[in-house]
């Protein structure tokens, strides 16, 4: 749940990879977090899932936990999508709906001042203890060093909701740690369990086509197959590369997504945590040099990137 009232999120500091994507045509977003080894007792707040998240679940495997899901009477609803395209074929475990027999794992809490509907907390340690399968991993390739070339930058700003700063995400590079510290709406993005600021070795802006099913502004259609532009940030460096996933919208969905550098070679992720910001091809993204991202940014120190140009391997 990335609504401003859902902050601070619980357990996000334990996630190995997080995606943020638009779920409303007005720019409201939601996040999908992947936990691959550290399973906190409390994670969330948990909200309803959207169809594009199912495609990512098929790519990674494992349990997909949510609290309600995208409905509708046509094929662009989550139940129909899972029955037609998922390896599971039914919207049941490991699709884990908190409005179900597993509701005990999704208690509501007022921790951190959260109120409904932004107060559903998931016990990930209980889910992990119950899950007996070992999903086939689809990892990135990794390097200890990360990028040593590219444009020197201090950070990046993505404002999904242009009418307000309620969904503004920013990253500021910390040379002492070699990580990009995350901010939401001008404040440090912290883990509600620990109070620590979340920081990432890899920040990727994934550009793709985004539309709305049957013109409904609450039902996103996000292309996560084929290829597109990727703006990649590591070690205080920025390059414009690409992404590719060899699958159709309904077939071979377990194929992994690969990121390439500006020369079309697969780009290893730097060892550490990764955040992927999914944006529309025409979404402006501000790349910042020299000035502090969390403070005022002089116009001459920033520039906006945009565009749909695609790179091929």
Annotate each PLM feature.
Residues 1-19, 24-312:
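A surface/extracellular/periplasmic glyco- and lipid-processing/surface-interacting theme
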């Amino acid at each position: 749940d990335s609504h401003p009232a859902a902050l601070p999120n619980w357990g996000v500091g334990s996630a190995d990879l997080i995606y943020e994507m638009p779920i409303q045509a007005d720019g409201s977003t939601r996040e999908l977090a992947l936990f691959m080894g550290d399973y906190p007792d409390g994670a969330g707040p948990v909200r309803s899932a959207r169809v594009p998240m199912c495609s990512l679940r098929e790519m990674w495997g494992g349990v997909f936990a949510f609290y309600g899901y995208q409905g509708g009477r046509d094929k662009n609803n989550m139940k129909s999508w899972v029955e037609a395209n998922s390896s599971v074929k039914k919207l049941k475990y490991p699709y884990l709906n908190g409005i179900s027999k597993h509701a005990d794992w999704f208690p509501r809490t007022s921790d951190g001042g959260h109120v409904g509907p932004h107060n559903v907390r998931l016990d990930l340690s209980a889910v992990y203890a119950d899950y007996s399968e070992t999903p086939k991993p689809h990892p990135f390739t990794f390097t200890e060093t990360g990028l040593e070339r590219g444009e020197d930058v201090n950070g990046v700003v993505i404002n999904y909701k242009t009418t307000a700063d309620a969904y503004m995400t920013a990253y500021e590079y910390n040379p002492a740690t070699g990580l990009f510290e995350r901010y939401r709406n001008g404040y440090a993005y912290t883990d509600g369990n620990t109070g620590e600021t979340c920081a990432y070795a890899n920040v990727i802006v994934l550009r793709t086509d985004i539309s709305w099913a049957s013109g409904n502004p609450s039902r996103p259609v996000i292309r996560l197959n084929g290829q597109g532009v990727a703006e990649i940030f590591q070690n205080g460096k920025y390059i414009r590369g690409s992404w590719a996933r060899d699958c159709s919208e309904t077939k071979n969905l377990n194929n992994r997504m690969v990121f390439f550098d500006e020369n079309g070679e697969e780009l290893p992720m730097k060892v550490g945590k990764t955040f992927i910001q999914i944006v529309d091809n025409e979404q402006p993204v501000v790349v910042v040099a020299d000035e502090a991202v969390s403070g005022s940014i002089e116009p001459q120190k920033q520039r906006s990137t945009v565009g749909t140009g695609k790179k091929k391997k």
